[in-house]
Amino acid sequence: MTGTSLTDTSSGLYFRDHSQGWLLRAQKQISYEVRLRDGIFRPECTDLLEQGAGTPGRSRRFVVVDSNVDLMYGNRIRSYFDYHGVDCSIMVVEANETLKNLETATRIVDEIDAFGIARRKEPLIVIGGGVLMDIVGLVASLYRRGAPFVRVPTTLIGLVDAGVGVKTGVNFNGHKNRLGTYTPADLTLLDRQFLATLDRRHIGNGLAEILKIALIKDLSLFAALEEHGPTLLDEKFQGSTAAGDRAARSVLHSAIHGMLDELQPNLWEAELERCVDYGHTFSPTVEMRALPELLHGEAVCVDMALTTVIAWRRGLLTEAQRDRIFAVMAALELPSWHPILDPDVLVNALQDTVRHRDGLQRLPLPVGIGGVTFVNDVTPRELEAAVTLQQELGDARTPKTSGDRGGRNL
């Protein structure tokens, strides 16, 4: 309707040329809460039941629980809902990147239909890691064109990244999160006590996303990881010592606040230059091609190592800063190189990211430690030179683990 006369009806509805055309403008107010709580399944803790409303006599909830979480916490979860008189159906789902697909999503929809949730007053509840939260978030966004839901992340990467934003999605056609929506959970409850049963590798996996925030916006957070990273790995954010507890609380708060601070003004990604995309230019392709060898945070760390080298070669970092970054990656027991990093793979990854970012690279690079800039001119030759140096630095820094590299993603 550009260039035509619009008549305002004072209600957000406009008509043109004696009602031969209309323009409707509407806004939707979005708010959601992220809350830190220790021990959310204690009987006296009612945070999980605040959303929605009960039906006469008894409230009802449909709960999706990760299969590993169910093994460790299933009895406690069921006892909690029984204690509060909640009629709940618990669906146990195996969730990993290979099962993050439409088939898993539609299985959940089938079970929701069988349970018969009320559209608005019986929010879905998801308890699990980032993969399961992404799937259930997508289901919630599509079910009856939008159902409320509550998230309880049980992994570190869920607490600091996947559980605090609004993205949902599943993998499709070999691409990570190719199908998805922007749908906030009504409430996210972050309980670090779940991390006590997480294996060491998955603590490191989440620390990679914390390191991302540190490198692009928070030098003090980087210094905290530099000083306390091994303790956080050892104590799994449980605060077994007074110093470890202070570090765990401070690092979690800084990482979550930093992420939300970046998301809030650009929640729907109208602006495609996003500093929180640091580490996510090459990693989606690298992660999918390396499945199941690399976890998400590990792929992000490999990406950050590559872009750290690119930044150093461009004079955005000193050699000392570059080496500090690689040293922290090693201290957090994260990989800083992987054999999948063939130059052709990286070029293909960058091309796909350019399409995702609407025709430009919009590649975030660290400026010093705690700053960021965006570039659009990285070349295949530059990638090849950078990954060669990355391999030299990564081979020297990446810890050689002898134990199981798998583990439960609770």
Curated annotation (Swiss-Prot):
<keyword id="KW-0170">Cobalt</keyword>
<dbReference type="Pfam" id="PF01761">
    <property type="entry name" value="DHQ_synthase"/>
</dbReference>
<feature type="active site">
    <location>
        <position position="167"/>
    </location>
</feature>
<dbReference type="InterPro" id="IPR035872">
    <property type="entry name" value="EEVS-like"/>
</dbReference>
<dbReference type="GO" id="GO:0003856">
    <property type="term" value="F:3-dehydroquinate synthase activity"/>
</dbReference>
<feature type="binding site">
    <location>
        <position position="66"/>
    </location>
    <ligand>
        <name>NAD(+)</name>
    </ligand>
</feature>
<keyword id="KW-0479">Metal-binding</keyword>
<feature type="binding site">
    <location>
        <begin position="154"/>
        <end position="155"/>
    </location>
    <ligand>
        <name>NAD(+)</name>
    </ligand>
</feature>
<protein>
    <recommendedName>
        <fullName>2-epi-5-epi-valiolone synthase</fullName>
        <ecNumber>4.2.3.152</ecNumber>
    </recommendedName>
</protein>
<keyword id="KW-0520">NAD</keyword>
<feature type="binding site">
    <location>
        <begin position="97"/>
        <end position="100"/>
    </location>
    <ligand>
        <name>NAD(+)</name>
    </ligand>
</feature>
<feature type="binding site">
    <location>
        <position position="176"/>
    </location>
    <ligand>
        <name>NAD(+)</name>
    </ligand>
</feature>
<feature type="binding site">
    <location>
        <position position="167"/>
    </location>
    <ligand>
        <name>NAD(+)</name>
    </ligand>
</feature>
<comment type="function">
    <text>Catalyzes the cyclization of D-sedoheptulose 7-phosphate to 2-epi-5-epi-valiolone. Involved in salbostatin biosynthesis.</text>
</comment>
<dbReference type="GO" id="GO:0046872">
    <property type="term" value="F:metal ion binding"/>
</dbReference>
<dbReference type="Pfam" id="PF24621">
    <property type="entry name" value="DHQS_C"/>
</dbReference>
<dbReference type="InterPro" id="IPR030960">
    <property type="entry name" value="DHQS/DOIS_N"/>
</dbReference>
<dbReference type="InterPro" id="IPR056179">
    <property type="entry name" value="DHQS_C"/>
</dbReference>
<dbReference type="GO" id="GO:0000166">
    <property type="term" value="F:nucleotide binding"/>
</dbReference>
<feature type="binding site">
    <location>
        <begin position="130"/>
        <end position="134"/>
    </location>
    <ligand>
        <name>NAD(+)</name>
    </ligand>
</feature>
<feature type="binding site">
    <location>
        <position position="296"/>
    </location>
    <ligand>
        <name>a divalent metal cation</name>
    </ligand>
</feature>
<comment type="similarity">
    <text>Belongs to the sugar phosphate cyclases superfamily. EEVS family.</text>
</comment>
<feature type="binding site">
    <location>
        <position position="280"/>
    </location>
    <ligand>
        <name>a divalent metal cation</name>
    </ligand>
</feature>
<dbReference type="GO" id="GO:0017000">
    <property type="term" value="P:antibiotic biosynthetic process"/>
</dbReference>
<feature type="binding site">
    <location>
        <begin position="194"/>
        <end position="197"/>
    </location>
    <ligand>
        <name>NAD(+)</name>
    </ligand>
</feature>
<keyword id="KW-0456">Lyase</keyword>
<feature type="binding site">
    <location>
        <position position="209"/>
    </location>
    <ligand>
        <name>a divalent metal cation</name>
    </ligand>
</feature>
<keyword id="KW-0547">Nucleotide-binding</keyword>
<dbReference type="InterPro" id="IPR050071">
    <property type="entry name" value="Dehydroquinate_synthase"/>
</dbReference>
